[in-house]
């Protein structure tokens, strides 16, 4: 650790450390909370021993920089040594929830819930179908799928701890908030609970959806001979397409159609469109997710399309694919025999296509922050599509 104290005094005060406002620079990285203490005298009792401290340019503030996004603003004086200790139990609980929230990759959780809700309503044929029986079937599918989703994203983090220290240092395994053993316990528990629920529900479409997702998610991430398919760009994209485009649409639709409603298998026009459209979207997500991660992927030998073809080319390929998908959706919506379906489908997809183009033109491809923000915007378009799908008839 390198430390530099110039023209400053450091004294112990009330169980903490007191720095007078002078130039202070301590160089050391660890798990840190972010604090901003604006005072000529600052008493700080950091949660962790080593902190990265830099003045904010005005000489009167102490900045501690974190490895994840949570920020706290604290004013403390020598007469308030308990400033960092109050409500410690509540704070510990909130921190635990925050760590699990980041571990679960919430954008995938939202996508899973919306996709299952949307395709489930594709099986609704009449108003009387909307009943407690339908919502019970949806709840069974959502809970089982969410637990499997946590297994898949958790296993990916366990396999990518070193890469995530470069690409996603805010994730709890990469930051050290979770130990490897904790991560293993979480993914093992959620996979077992997912299969248990799928089995007791007694729906074969649901159980096979969970099983195939488990197999593909494991093969995608785990570092074993002939596996860790994420190393190969085309195979990785096919895994994501299989789960997000095919399994989600068909298996969960059949869960409602055959298990909940007890009807024969029937592939409707909206289901076929949803599967085709989400195939495009899943390819885009598979390609786009690696654009901001190019630095770590290069270091650890992950041959993503962004590494081999370049960020700019992959970025505009993704935008073009989505615009093509929206054009097809507009044409399909325009052929609907129902006026209300035609209006909602056409207007909705025109708005989404226009919004995507405007956002893409504004992205600075040299900024990892902007690319990551645009990737999360792609997920919002993904959510919006699932809101539109039930209106396609």
UniProtKB/Swiss-Prot annotation:
Bilayer topology annotation: Multi-pass membrane protein
Signal sequence, start to end: none
Membrane-spanning intervals of the chain: 108-128, 133-153, 170-190, 205-227, 232-252, 271-291, 314-334, 338-358, 371-391
Phenotype of gene-disrupted mutants: Reduced seed longevity, severe seedling growth defects during germination and high levels of lipid hydroperoxides and hydroxy fatty acids.
EC id: 2.5.1.115
Reaction equation(s) it catalyzes: phytyl diphosphate + homogentisate + H(+) = 2-methyl-6-phytyl-1,4-benzene-1,4-diol + CO2 + diphosphate
GO cellular component assignments: chloroplast; chloroplast membrane
Any single biological process term in GO: response to temperature stimulus
Keyword Transit peptide belongs to the record: yes
Note: Seeds and plants overexpressing HPT1 accumulate increased levels of tocopherol.
Record NCBIfam families: PRK12887.1 (NF009525)
Functional note: Involved in the synthesis of tocopherol (vitamin E). Catalyzes the condensation of homogentisate and phytyl diphosphate to form dimethylphytylhydrquinone. Low activity with geranylgeranyl diphosphate as substrate, but no activity with farnesyl diphosphate or solanesyl diphosphate. Tocopherol functions to limit lipid oxidation during seed desiccation, quiescence and germination and early seedling development. Protects thylakoid membrane lipids from photooxidation and is required for low-temperature adaptation.
Official protein name in the record: Homogentisate phytyltransferase 1, chloroplastic
Name of encoding gene: HPT1
């Amino acid at each position: 650790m390198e430390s530099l104290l110039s023209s400053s005094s450091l004294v112990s005060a009330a169980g903490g450390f007191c720095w007078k406002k002078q130039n202070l620079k301590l160089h050391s990285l660890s798990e840190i909370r972010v604090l901003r203490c604006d005072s000529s005298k600052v008493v700080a009792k950091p949660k962790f021993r080593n902190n990265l401290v830099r003045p904010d340019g005005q000489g009167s503030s102490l900045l501690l920089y974190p490895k994840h996004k949570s920020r706290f603003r604290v004013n403390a004086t020598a007469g308030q040594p308990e400033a960092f200790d109050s409500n410690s139990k509540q704070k510990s609980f909130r921190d635990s929830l925050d760590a699990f929230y980041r571990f679960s990759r919430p954008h995938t959780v939202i996508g899973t819930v919306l996709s299952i809700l949307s395709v489930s309503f594709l099986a609704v044929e009449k108003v009387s179908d909307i009943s407690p029986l339908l919502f019970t079937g949806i709840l069974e599918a959502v809970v089982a799928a969410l637990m499997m989703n946590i297994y898949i994203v958790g296993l990916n983090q366990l396999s990518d701890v070193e890469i995530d220290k470069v690409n996603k240092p805010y994730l709890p395994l990469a930051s050290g908030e979770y130990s490897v053993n904790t991560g293993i316990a979480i993914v093992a528990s959620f996979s077992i609970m997912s299969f248990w629920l799928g089995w007791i529900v007694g729906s074969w479409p649901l159980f096979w959806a969970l099983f195939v997702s488990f197999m593909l998610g494991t093969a995608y991430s785990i570092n074993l001979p002939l596996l860790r398919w994420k190393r190969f760009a085309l195979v990785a994209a096919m895994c994501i397409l299989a789960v997000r485009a095919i399994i989600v649409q068909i298996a969960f639709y059949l869960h409602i159609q055959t298990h909940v409603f007890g009807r024969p298998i029937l592939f409707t026009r909206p289901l076929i469109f949803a599967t085709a459209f989400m195939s495009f979207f899943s390819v885009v997500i598979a390609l786009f997710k690696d654009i901001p991660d190019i630095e770590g992927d290069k270091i650890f030998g992950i041959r993503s399309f962004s590494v081999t073809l370049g960020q700019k080319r992959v970025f505009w390929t993704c935008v073009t694919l989505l615009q093509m998908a929206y054009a097809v959706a507009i044409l399909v919506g325009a052929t609907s025999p129902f006026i209300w379906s035609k209006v909602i489908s056409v207007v909705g997809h025109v708005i989404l296509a226009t919004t995507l183009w405007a956002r893409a033109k504004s992205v600075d491809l040299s900024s990892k922050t902007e690319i990551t923000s645009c990737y999360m915007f792609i997920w919002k378009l993904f959510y919006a599509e699932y809101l539109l799908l039930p209106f396609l008839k």
